[in-house]
Amino acid sequence: MARNCLRINHEGDSIQLFWQRGQSNPRHAPSVTFTHPFDKQALADLRWYLEEYLRFPYGIAPDNAAKIEQKFQDWGEQLFELVFRSSEKAREFFQTATFDGLRECELVITSDSPEVLNLPWELLYSPSDRQFLAPSLAGMSRSLSDYAVRAEMSNLPQDKLNILLVIARPYGEKDIALKTIARPLLESVSHIRQKVNIKVLRPPSFEQFERELNAHPGFYHIVHFDGHGDFDPNSVGFQHTLGAAGQGVLVFEADDGSPQIIPAAQIAQNLADCRVPIFVLNACKSAQEGEEKFSSVATRLVSLGAKGVVAMAYSVYAEAAKHFMGRLYGELAAGATVDSAVAAGRREILNKRLRPSPNGDKPLQDWLVPVLYQQESYTPFIPASDTDVLDIDDFLEPTVSNLVGFPQEGRYGFIGRDYDILRLERAFRQNNIVLLQGMAGVGKTELACGLARWLEETQGRTGKIFFMSFEQGATLSNVVNQVGREVWGDKFSQYRAEQQQQAILKYLKTQSSLLIWDNFEPVAGFPAGNEPLLNGSERDNLQRFLKDLRGGKSWVLITSRREESWLDCGYRLLELRGLREQDVEELAAKILETVGVDRKNLPSEYLELLKLLGGHPFSLRVVLPHLKTQQPKQLIESLRQGLDTLDGTPDKVREKSLAVSLDYSFAKLSERARRHLPFLALFSEQVDAGWLHAFSSNPDDEDGQAYQAVFGENLQKADWLRLLNEAAAAGILEHLGETIYKIHPALPWYLRQRLSEQHAAQEVSELEKKLLVFYAVLADNYRKELISNAEMASFVLRVEEPNLLQNLRLAEQQQSWAEAQVILQALGEVHKRIGRKPEF
């Protein structure tokens, strides 16, 4: 605790400074008349700088921002003069209290006036010390004048810092992003997760809030409310010093997603009854006019017994929130007082001031955004001291995950989609089977995987979360075996198929799990008229299985390019569109960073280009790398020439716009790359340059001759690596490591079109037949290698499984039963070795 405390007490139309050292009696300076130091324009400028400037930092905006930053010191000196130079005694108190350094002094502003409490006191600036006080003080808080300190809380758990996170977004797409605070919060405490327990309230309704707290009284140290606040002047039960009735309210979210307005007094009573000492409150973009919305909520909570309320005086950027929340919760988990933890979080924001913008990362002075309301200093959590040297096993212990069968995350990670995750969660509240429909390349798989990781991190599903791709025609047997092996291990294979399915159904109906069935459209044939991947009997099995799961505790998420009405299971349909504007900017920033383009050097037309690409992730990936050699205006003109030729329904235009983006990117590749890359249309999910070389390099064997007949020349491994790396640099492929490259699901469709345009159908068909034989030989060779070199052979067969399955389908269509048999034998053997034999 700091040795010195300076208290600024406001009452009526005057303020008075008090100084207390340690436990000695407080001393006071003469009271002086309080005059509001800021006009409305100054407060409006401050809000614009903190909330709006970085949204569009072009034109005169940077100059205006610089001028406002320069005013920070002037505004801070005005506050300092008002408080610490109003009398000789006040001047003396400040000098004495800070003689040992600002770190030995805490500052408290006491008032019952929202107008005073809402002032940016954090801007206090000492001319003699030439620094702002807030970042260096031991602590800075606001408190109420006429409310006594409540009795001590009873003991709370000390094994973990328990946090209940309430994320309310009742205004849908117009609301701020779902994970604006939650994502940086989770990331920032990832290194101390063994000390922190975070649970997200689902649904974020007040009824569920009451149930959760009453079910766990004396358990939560902190309730973190991430949502909207307001002030209701007609609410009864609270009087301001100016005599106006009313009180603050928070907006929860009803089960149907509509707003649920709850008075602060009602919330505070629940916190008090269930012994929750700390409330963390995030401001939202709706509170822009400067009304006393959040101060009214914070003061109400403190007046009714909360030990501390941490709030954001302005909307906070995710990057700043990450730094602040990480340090705040890290300090609290280590046993700090709330005021010292807030001070540490403020310093973290000050030291890491770069914030993302469309024009590159820019510094922002937003360390004044967090504020603390409390009646006294309080320590919510005191961890058990452990002086023992940690055992090496503590560091080698594997991370436990509920995710099963998930693909590797893409190079840019999961970005945005907050509103879509919100839509999915709401849909699952009403129906446990949801179909997510969207065009190729729009990001259905990424969203499904992002939802799964979000649910795992926030305890949204207590059971396992399973991912299964149907791109190569998975069956119900695959689904049953995946779940069974994960839940019951090798024991599962001892039971008959009927018993296995019965057990899986019972498990899924009674456990809070999630099944993700990805790329489902080929199951019944896609595009329309194509032969289904699964026969009628297998499709009926999937249909019955889904019907049996209806109404159970597990959720099923199906992704497809179209509606799957044949399932006839009463699923909820959601359509997926492009990314939102801010998410587009974030993804674009990562793409440009990868290719070495500095956004600071791009003109404002860059934002017009992003808008033209319609938030389509794959289009962004293939177009933006060209900014390395071209200006945004040139790209816009070229793309518009292609788009002007499009007509049809909006969905058709969007799908064709992807082709336009790919056309543009393809046109910029070398002639050799444009000629040979369409060969990848015959591959699925990923491709190995080594096998491309083995098939296409030798002009003296049948494979090489077939390749040369279509593409005009034979290619060696070095040639393929150059072409694949060129495509990866253009965003068309993704390099996974060594000689393996990832193929986006939308790419084979596009490459197949180019292949058909450039070559006769008979030529392509002959090439496919040669590739089928090639993969059959590969499968047979590595099946034999399983005896002498099992590890290497298993690795090759599992990596090539998508391509083997694709060629297995081709063998079935062409009735090439010899090739089908050897591919099946190889996959069956490797699946047997890894416990997946029942799938075959």
Residue ranges and their predicted role:
Residues 309, 417, 446-450, 474-484, ...:
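Alpha-helical sensor/transducer elements of the RecA-like P-loop NTPase core
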Residues 761-840:
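Extended alpha-helical scaffolding segments used for macromolecular assembly and cargo binding
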Residues 134-148, 247, 256-274, 333-409:
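Caspase-like cysteine protease fold
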Residues 1-135, 157:
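Non-catalytic, solvent-exposed interaction/assembly segments
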Residues 150-253, 281:
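A domain-level signal for caspase-like cysteine endopeptidase catalytic cores
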Residues 448-453, 502, 513, 554, ...:
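C-terminal boundary/linker of central alpha/beta nucleotide-binding cores
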